[in-house]
Amino acid sequence: DPIIEQARSALSAHYRDELGETFRTVGMCLYRGGQDSVAWHGDRFGRGATHDTMVAIVSIGAPRALLLRPRNGGPSIRHVVGHGDLLVMGGSCQRTWDHCVPKTSASGPRISMQFRTRGVR
């Protein structure tokens, strides 16, 4: 899709100095409503298990909360991600923090586009 490719190219250009590489893949999640959710996890597969990485998330649609908490315990931090927002998880975030999108009583559809570099899942 040309719009997704434009977003990938723009994000790659913006973060190239920090990343040292381009974003290679984009994954998409459709949240049909408030009952669709993602459990606590960290993207620690591939290089993300041992290296600092970056995931750039573009949100389209209804606002949803994204929670972050330290992997070894501690209070969570709540971010509401709205239509057109960009959330970047970089550095050691994937190895040292978990994140989730909890269920909610009121929410419309949302698409989350996650841009990743080579070997990050």
Regions found by a protein language model. Give the residues of each.
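Non-heme Fe(II) oxygenase metal-center motifs and adjacent flexible, charged/small-residue loops
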Residues: 1-121
